[in-house]
From Swiss-Prot:
It comes from Homo sapiens (Human). This is Tyrosine-protein kinase Mer. GO terms for molecular function: ATP binding; transmembrane receptor protein tyrosine kinase activity. It is linked to Retinitis pigmentosa 38: A retinal dystrophy belonging to the group of pigmentary retinopathies. Retinitis pigmentosa is characterized by retinal pigment deposits visible on fundus examination and primary loss of rod photoreceptor cells followed by secondary loss of cone photoreceptors. Patients typically have night vision blindness and loss of midperipheral visual field. As their condition progresses, they lose their far peripheral visual field and eventually central vision as well. Not expressed in normal B- and T-lymphocytes but is expressed in numerous neoplastic B- and T-cell lines. Highly expressed in testis, ovary, prostate, lung, and kidney, with lower expression in spleen, small intestine, colon, and liver. The active site is at D723 (proton acceptor). It comes from the Eukaryota. The keyword Lyase does not apply. It is a single-pass type I membrane protein.
Amino acid sequence: MGPAPLPLLLGLFLPALWRRAITEAREEAKPYPLFPGPFPGSLQTDHTPLLSLPHASGYQPALMFSPTQPGRPHTGNVAIPQVTSVESKPLPPLAFKHTVGHIILSEHKGVKFNCSISVPNIYQDTTISWWKDGKELLGAHHAITQFYPDDEVTAIIASFSITSVQRSDNGSYICKMKINNEEIVSDPIYIEVQGLPHFTKQPESMNVTRNTAFNLTCQAVGPPEPVNIFWVQNSSRVNEQPEKSPSVLTVPGLTEMAVFSCEAHNDKGLTVSKGVQINIKAIPSPPTEVSIRNSTAHSILISWVPGFDGYSPFRNCSIQVKEADPLSNGSVMIFNTSALPHLYQIKQLQALANYSIGVSCMNEIGWSAVSPWILASTTEGAPSVAPLNVTVFLNESSDNVDIRWMKPPTKQQDGELVGYRISHVWQSAGISKELLEEVGQNGSRARISVQVHNATCTVRIAAVTRGGVGPFSDPVKIFIPAHGWVDYAPSSTPAPGNADPVLIIFGCFCGFILIGLILYISLAIRKRVQETKFGNAFTEEDSELVVNYIAKKSFCRRAIELTLHSLGVSEELQNKLEDVVIDRNLLILGKILGEGEFGSVMEGNLKQEDGTSLKVAVKTMKLDNSSQREIEEFLSEAACMKDFSHPNVIRLLGVCIEMSSQGIPKPMVILPFMKYGDLHTYLLYSRLETGPKHIPLQTLLKFMVDIALGMEYLSNRNFLHRDLAARNCMLRDDMTVCVADFGLSKKIYSGDYYRQGRIAKMPVKWIAIESLADRVYTSKSDVWAFGVTMWEIATRGMTPYPGVQNHEMYDYLLHGHRLKQPEDCLDELYEIMYSCWRTDPLDRPTFSVLRLQLEKLLESLPDVRNQADVIYVNTQLLESSEGLAQGSTLAPLDLNIDPDSIIASCTPRAAISVVTAEVHDSKPHEGRYILNGGSEEWEDLTSAPSAAVTAEKNSVLPGERLVRNGVSWSHSSMLPLGSSLPDELLFADDSSEGSEVLM
């Protein structure tokens, strides 16, 4: 018959067979009709759909239905619609068919899976949506929904395919359908993508000190797990046995440069990290190309090119200057300056002199050699002094005025004299006339003609060089009479002469007698005033003296000393505070700014010497529950601040003593008033207050630089703060940060450490690991606390180590745990933070190094001019803001940000009938699907700001749980989700940032 009849027979018999199979399946499945065939449970299907439509529209069922009756039972992913037909038969519950549960495949492979459900024909416009990890997948074109209608039910199959899976495709996928306001959810399908190890943290290049230990970290993840790490140094393996990821390599020290890398192995193969170079810090090379940029009579401007920095940033440079004259004493003048901008103007030089100049720069290791010496000369200048001993004579016979003088000292001529300029002014009968005369360089006298008789002549003389005219001498006046003549006028600077010694001795004797007489009279008057305080002592000689009242002499100390002594503090502390005690009458107290368990801070006004009033902050103590030791510590903090003078360290204005109502003296410390309060509260308000304020990253870095400057100043003065935190840093009116609260600070007089000898309340989460163990404090302990403070600033006021109790901190740090990198924190900034938390205090940088690193990072960032330059976007993290003051204000920031550019509307859209998911397209920006937030309480912040606040309190933020470096994270915690501490560290606490324990 040939091949032609075969398709004809198939076309005749297959539809009949198919209808018969459907009828039999329906009869067997009653009263629960199911979709006939193997489609629902298969991972891939090859069946040709009878109907493939976006949605089954236009199909009119013959059955009547009503909504779900209240009180009818239904569970989980099952919807039980109540349908009434002509025969009033109830419909069975609806549910998705069981499908494959777990799919494991390699990276870059393709995968396809589906879910299916049989729905009565009475339900029209039913759609199936795909969800991944609680987020709806929108706009994906590889999701296809197929419909297979029958007489009573329609089988719906939704398939989802990914052409080339990636690690980000890991997750749980489900199907959702809504029927009669009931949501039906399918069983989850778990996709696990396996491949070569993926590095989440690779070793970083470092510059280390010679023979100083340092650590390198390498971390990689699968799946499959486990991932083992091998370390390689200069192409040779360091460890023969692998270490499980993450791995920390401790290098005891190097004497020469080395290259390190790490290898990550799992069952799929091996991945090699980038090679990093570890450089050894060395003394820098001397500067080169020292040149003269400009030269004047008393200054020289030089420039230079810095040499190799020895893998350590330059700190400062020294300019050495010595006179090139062989007759000079050979002394060297040294001028210190910052390393940048490689320019320096040398001042206070002599005019018309030759100098040899050399430059040397230093880094952390030491000073470089001096650059090659260069020769420089200053130019000629005008004389710096006037001629000396100017005298004027009148020669009536020749009708002339003779003038004599002495030339200025040679060193003060500032050049070669070319002559003198004489100014003579003639004044007579209200008429004034000034004339100028020029005299040659060899002259020391001059003669001028009399211009007017019966007049006054005023003469001044100035020396002249090629550099200009020097200052004029003091005026010398002589009167020219009409008849007769004056032959001499006193000089402006008379020459020293001999005086009669008898006259000198007599004058001194008379002076001593006069001084003694004045003292005697003043004492006598004072005594009389005291004796007559209670009566009249000046009676008549013949009167009878009945009672003589004499004022009792008091030998008490001054009131200030007595008040300080009554506090019971040590004599040493009294002497320190004596010169800063302020009269209580000069201070007016105002409202309370803050109050705690042991004291309060009040607003005040301090009267100044010029009559003005200064707004101040006054710290007081509650004497009811304060011991004598706490009072002395309170005043010791004031004594500590007395000698500080730095723009980034709060200064002491004074100490005031006030008698309380119980008659007990109460100390008060007077400090500058800070408009914006402490830094921690300011950061919290910027993030949690209604209508959060945006603080650019550049401003946060400026806060860190200010604190580093203040701590550098304290460290150089051998002071340990021991309580550095954001809450103890204050904000001035110009947004400058000041280090404050020196209640725990200590002065180091010998050595470089301080051992705490008694139990005290300490801020545990800011204390370095060695201080927790041994109660030993150094400046490097303050560096640790500075790193935690930087973390507070970067997170805008979050509490460090959330979920870790105070008594767990030492074990937590001992196991190598540290604060994690905050969201939106630059890698360079986190590296600076992390360097502050090195276990060995010697490995931590100094405050000078930290300041230079932060300034360099701040300079590398662009200036904040518009929203396009903003690096940080406020994500409005969820954190309780209870207890914050109402109506508080923040400092205005010179930045205008369009809310539309910060966050887009997250309002879920209406249900759509076609479910698609665009996955891994070949175009660069269309290769991933879009995740919907899935929260109905979010509103567009631009149109409803109040709704955004509601959403912040009641809904899960989009992206609140995210994946960073292969580990799930949460905004509410800086610890990885799912990670656990050691066995003894399994409990979280609800302590605040001020948590303290007894040490």
